[in-house]
Amino acid sequence: MNIRATRCFLLTCTAIAALSPLSAAAQGLPPDATALQTIVLKGKRVKAGDIVNTPLASHTTEEEIEKKQVQSIEDLGRSLEPGVNYSRGTTNSLNIRGLEGNRVATVIGGVPLTYLQDTARSTAGGAESFDFFALTSVDVVRGADSSRIGDGGLGGALVLRTLEPEDLIGEGRDWGGKVGTGYDSMDNSWYGGAAVAKRVENTSALFLGSYKKGDERDNKGDVGGYGATRTEPNPADYDQHNLLFKLRQDTELGHVFGLTAERFRFEKDTDLRRDQMLTGNYRPGSHSNGQLNERDRVSLDYFYEAPSSDGLVDAAEATLYWQRQLRQDSQDSIRWASVPGVYKRWNDIEESGFGFNGFFDSGFETGGVSHVLTFGTDIFISRAEQYSAGVDSCPASPPYTGVYGACGNLHTNQADMPDVDSKRMSFYVQDRMSFGDSGFTLTPALRYDWFDHHPQATAAYLGNAMKPDTPPGSSGDAWSPKLLAEYELSDTFTLFGQWAMGFRSPTASELYMTFGAPGTYLRTGNPYLEPETSNGFDVGARFGDSDFGGSLTFFYTRYKNFIENRNLTAAEQIARGIDPSAGYMFVQTPVNVSRAEIYGIELAAHKRFDNGFNMRAGLAYARGTNLGTDQLLASVPPLKGIIGVGYETEAWGVDLLWTGVEGVDDQSAASFKAPGYGIFDLTGWWEPEQVKGLRIQAGVYNLFDRTYYDALNTKDYTTITAANEEYYSEPGRTFRISLTQRF
């Protein structure tokens, strides 16, 4: 840990340590005072089989989401979860414990979201296809909990729960709702949303709709115009829509049957002025790109809470669902020098399918040991499709010469991979054993995952410029055990240790993508990839309650068979059936080449005082190394610390938050080594007594207008120089205001 990291570490630890001696003064606090990731050891019962029932999970409520004005994953990591990050650079991905993309999982309403990635055309994203306005809670599960997360959760999971009718219908009422609106100067955006729920006897329904419209994300650049010297952001505008419908039927025997339907759409257009020049291939006003994220989901839901403790099953949940996700990157241009004329592209990658997941808990006793046995399963049958449509002035067939020389590598109106029919199936079992009154709990668990990918030749794929054969199928399986030990020293202090293995199967894109042509370059999939696996250890403690508490976790994880892209040697090309004499500039394919390790520490603490003041602090530090090259992993973010001080009454509150991040290590594989920074945010909220249910939130972010860079957003860019680096900077001072009315 370098000097900058040590300073940040010591400052945050000092704040955490300072909370402890002050605890004696805390008695009777405002009931709605908030804190950074409050740790509650005793409270509402969580089903043993629930994905968040682990000491490695932290919980954020709807109230905290609203008060902290959390509207994105980045907001969550900035104000509440220092170990959660979002990479907007090339991956458009959630990042937990230094892993991102398809190595972390996102689950909403019990349904996993797919991270869509076209490895040939740099299209990626999809796991962020949700709206925070629709959420009732956010849980972050750290590490590979093999008993619940399963395929793709090597780094952890973001578990999202959407509003239920009961969240809006107050006690003694048969209907309720909320409306919200707000403005953010960071991207000149405003949003509006409304949700209403109604109950008739044992039947309840909820409908929610929200809309957001904005422009480009601000930065600290001040050079406008066109070309590579521009540091102001490219002009952009976006629209976001979200719809949610739920129908629930309660029974008097503890069963709840439901129907859920969701529709999410995000669409953005950007004027690429940095790529335009008066005499260049792209002229001013004639070069833009687009981005589209879509997600549709319909599910039948089932919940069960046993009305008494003498039944065989204590609790159960199940979801039968259909889901479709689409990611599209597009280009709308006129070219002037190379391939002159209209140039349009629509690059799509889509996955749709049917799935089922569920579990049940069964409690019983043997001797002096209390057991809660959980059985569960996850099944998903899907089809992945990729297609690139386009319009350009390229001749219908080669040879391509003169201004059309680039046409040899401008492949369009083709599929870069076959349609892929996939099946994923898993079963898991765990037994939470409590040994009398000793406070000791032991939870062994075992999960079995199986996958099968079967490519289907289509006319669009057979028309690929490489004229490929249909590749072979790919299948595999894995056993992932877990052992969790917990020792409750008191009602408010628990020690824990966990060993768990994790698993990620190769994606259809990694297996079967083919893009290129002789004389240019070739990117090709690898149908013989092995799954990635992890072997991790966590030890730590959780203590306290909502008034004074915290957590401390140390973790170490080894990863095997990491999938990375690598250029093939001539001998390797021959072994793959590729002719090196075809004149490829390079041949790149994903291979299982590396082992890696990531270790670190996570801390959180909070304290609330009887005079209305509160303090909180958090820290996330991780270090990751590619053991094949001894180079630091670029996907592992630098140390981040958060220190906050606030004051609250029953009607209003104010918070001052400092976020400090160290600079990227010189040994990192990151192309750009982002320097460290420290920024302040000032936020507040007010609930006027005259208007019941109204809450107004406001905040000033980056209070002192610092210029800083996000390490994950910039790690893959090789063109950053001292002259243009402000184009890649984060927003300066911005403000945000929002209003929520419950009725």
PLM region spans:
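Acidic, small-polar-rich N-terminal luminal/periplasmic segments of exported/outer-membrane proteins
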Residues: 32-168, 539
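Periplasmic-side early beta-strands and strand-to-turn transitions of outer-membrane beta-barrels
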Residues: 166, 173-180, 184, 188-291, ...
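Structural signature of Gram-negative outer-membrane beta-barrels, strongest in the C-terminal barrel
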Residues: 370, 378, 415-558, 608, ...
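Outer membrane beta-barrel strand-and-loop segments of large Gram-negative receptors
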Residues: 349-359, 524-530, 536, 543-614, ...
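C-terminal beta-signal and adjacent terminal beta-strands/loops
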Residues: 503, 554-561, 565-567, 663, ...
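Gram-negative outer-membrane beta-barrel transporters
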Residues: 360, 435-436, 440-442, 555-559, ...
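Transmembrane beta-strands of outer-membrane beta-barrel pores
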Residues: 162, 181-187, 200-202, 211-215, ...
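Flexible loop and strand-edge segments within Gram-negative outer membrane beta-barrel domains
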Residues: 234-236, 254-311, 325-350, 518
